[in-house]
């Protein structure tokens, strides 16, 4: 006869359950989910629990959880709500024994069973907990990543019921997907906090090192100011027949655009690319070619866009100093303007406005009465001159020293003005600034002593000091003529121009714009050769700054100088003299603010060494009062 089932509460059944639990405790180190089981037991608070021979909570905890398999959905039995406790997980349905499905109630109820266990149960669980803590001290939890196992880990049938399709084969699992308890998360956060603390310490060390090395950076930056790019940027030859090309794609290649324009319309002489505004200016040899090119290039397909083209306007009225690289042709050239342009290194002071001024020969009609011209030879109380500076740094240095030096061809006019007039006012402007820097009064004659000469333009742009434009030749093809790329990246200029005819050398005597650009090219070449005229020396004289308040060119719109072909005052060269009434009107736009802030009196025993190496007194020349803020 088979053994009859034992009545409830018998000691034999309790002994059988205890033996099964002892076997399970000895084998739990090989159990794939031992760490999670021990963690669950550690996290259980002491509370109300049920103990008895039919308590299957311990067996239920040994079953695998659906979250240990990828893609497994959590299942809730008997309509129980999903688990909201981070420590307790819903138990899956097991097959093979109906007693496992006869436990109603939420899963949280069965997690609190530790308090009601017999002493021998509790001792074995404490032993497993200690082993689990030893494993947690290592780099990773025991058997935390099931993806390390090629085959599923199996246990004896006395501990696991046969599983159906509810638990598929193991697959690749996401990292840290098995550890849902707070202990691995806390351990991970400890490592993160440790790395974050190290990073903060490293950042603080970097800040300290930066503060210590800051004076060296400032010193290097101060030394690099001596290699300032001087002079205006190079510009292509201006034929007076130009079109504007817009809607260029970003980062347009210059030669790709030149090839496209030459293919669509022949007769291109130069193309100036403005990358910042995605546009370009193209010069053509005559008006007919210019009009034809505008019609063909407009709405033409370039790469992936449609280009927009317009004819260039034939006037420079209303310009604010930042003019386009192309301009209208000269209808009545002025010979006196072209004669002022010297073919030496001093021609680098020609500004953008100067080149446009040389082509704008036909002055617009003046609706208001023109100012009465004063005879320059007649004695005058006041004289006004426009002086150009290569850089703003030279002007700021002059504020500190009260010394200025001009070009040689201006010295005679300034000396004569100082002798005949009561006051000589000098209005300063830096190249490419689009504004007046300020104005000062001449307080001494120009020192004719050769020993006092200073090098106000150090070595006249020697190739070793500044970056000069790079000329890159280009070969001709079926559409494009032979030419060259002028890359002046230091000044933000790049353009292409066709080579001029060999018989004319690219200079037309009747085109003052072309002559000015040609002279500018000669000056750059003379700087490269480093000939005897490469050093530009100036003789110093004393000035008293009256205002360093900046005056933009647009504020002087409408003020014209009768002594400069009635052009606007902003269109002037270095040394241009203003008609006295115009000079008074222009200086009246300045204010006296800013002189006291920028003016710094040097120590009486301190001497400045000028560019030519000649020691100059730091203060004023003996016999002249020091400068004061007006």
UniProtKB/Swiss-Prot annotation:
Recorded GO CC terms: nucleoplasm; P-body
A biological process from GO: regulation of alternative mRNA splicing, via spliceosome
Major localisation: cytoplasm
Annotated keywords: Cytoplasm
Keyword Transmembrane: no
Effect of a null allele: Does not seem to affect growth nor conidiation. Displays milder disease lesions on rice leaves.
Annotated stretches, region: Disordered: 38-113, 160-183, 200-241
Gene3D superfamilies documented for this protein: 3.30.70.330, ph1033 like domains (3.10.590.10)
Statement: the UniProt record of this protein carries the keyword Heme: no
UniProt xrefs under InterPro entries: Nucleotide-bd_a/b_plait_sf, RBD_domain_sf, RRM_dom, YTH_domain, YTH_prot
Molecular-function GO terms, alphabetical: mRNA binding; N6-methyladenosine-containing RNA reader activity
Subcellular location: Cytoplasm, P-body
Similarity comment text for this entry: Belongs to the YTHDF family. YTHDF1 subfamily.
Protein name in the entry: YTH domain-containing family protein 1
């Amino acid at each position: 006869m088979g053994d009859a089932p034992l009545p409830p509460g018998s000691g034999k059944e309790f002994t059988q359950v205890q033996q099964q639990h002892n076997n399970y405790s000895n084998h739990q180190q090989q159990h794939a989910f031992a760490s999670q089981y021990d963690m669950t037991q550690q996290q259980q608070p002491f509370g109300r629990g049920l103990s008895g021979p039919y308590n299957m909570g311990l067996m239920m905890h040994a079953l695998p959880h659906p979250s240990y398999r990828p893609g497994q959905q959590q299942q809730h039995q008997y309509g129980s709500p999903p688990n909201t406790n981070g420590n307790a997980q819903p138990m899956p349905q097991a097959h093979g024994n109906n007693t496992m499905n006869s436990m109603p109630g939420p899963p949280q109820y069965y997690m609190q069973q530790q308090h009601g266990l017999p002493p021998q149960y509790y001792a074995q669980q404490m032993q497993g907990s200690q082993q689990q803590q030893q494993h947690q001290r290592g780099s990773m939890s025991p058997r935390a990543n099931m993806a390390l196992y090629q085959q599923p880990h199996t246990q004896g049938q006395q501990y696991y019921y046969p599983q159906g399709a509810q638990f598929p084969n193991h697959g690749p699992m996401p990292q840290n997907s098995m550890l849902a308890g707070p202990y691995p998360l806390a351990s991970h956060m400890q490592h993160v906090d440790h790395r974050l603390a190290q990073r903060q310490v490293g950042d603080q060390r970097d800040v300290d090192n930066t503060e210590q090395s800051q004076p060296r950076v400032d010193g290097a930056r101060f030394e690099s100011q001596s290699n300032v790019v001087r002079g205006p940027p190079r510009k292509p030859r201006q034929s007076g027949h130009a079109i504007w090309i817009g809607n260029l794609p970003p980062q347009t290649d210059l030669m790709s655009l030149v090839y496209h324009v030459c293919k669509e319309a022949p007769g291109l002489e130069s193309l100036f690319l403005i990358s910042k505004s995605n546009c370009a200016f193209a010069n053509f040899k005559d008006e007919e070619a210019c009009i034809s090119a505008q019609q063909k290039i407009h709405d033409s397909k370039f790469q992936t866009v449609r280009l927009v083209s317009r004819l260039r306007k034939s006037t420079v009225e209303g310009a604010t100093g930042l003019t386009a690289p192309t301009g209208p042709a000269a209808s009545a050239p002025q010979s006196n303007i072209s004669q002022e342009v010297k073919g030496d290194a001093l021609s680098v002071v020609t500004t953008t406005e100067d080149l446009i001024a040389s082509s704008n020969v036909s002055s617009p009609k003046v609706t208001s009465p023109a100012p009465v011209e004063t005879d320059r030879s007649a004695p005058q109380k006041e004289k006004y001159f426009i002086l150009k500076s290569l850089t703003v740094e030279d002007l700021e240095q002059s504020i500190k020293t009260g010394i200025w030096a001009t070009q040689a061809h201006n010295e005679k006019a300034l000396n004569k003005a100082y002798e005949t007039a009561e006051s000589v006012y000098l209005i300063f402007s830096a190249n490419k600034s689009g504004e007046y820097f300020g104005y000062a009064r001449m307080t001494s004659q120009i020192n004719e002593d050769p020993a006092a000469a200073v090098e106000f333009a150090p070595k006249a742009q020697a190739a070793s000091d500044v970056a000069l434009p790079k000329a890159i030749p280009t070969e001709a093809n079926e559409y494009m003529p032979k030419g060259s790329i002028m890359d002046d990246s230091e000044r933000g200029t790049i353009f292409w121009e066709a080579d001029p005819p060999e018989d004319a050398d690219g200079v037309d005597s009747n085109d003052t714009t072309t002559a000015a650009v040609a002279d500018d090219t000669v000056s750059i070449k003379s700087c490269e050769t480093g000939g005897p005229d490469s050093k530009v020396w100036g003789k110093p004289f004393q000035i008293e700054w009256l205002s360093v308040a900046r005056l933009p060119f647009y504020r002087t719109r409408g003020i014209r100088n009768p002594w400069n072909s009635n052009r606007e005052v902003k269109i002037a060269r270095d040394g241009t003299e203003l008609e006295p009434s115009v000079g008074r009107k222009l200086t009246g736009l300045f204010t006296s603010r800013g002189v006291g802030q920028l003016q710094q009196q040097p120590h009486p025993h301190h001497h400045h060494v000028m560019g030519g190496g000649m020691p100059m007194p730091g203060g004023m020349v003996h016999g002249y009062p020091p400068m004061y803020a007006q």
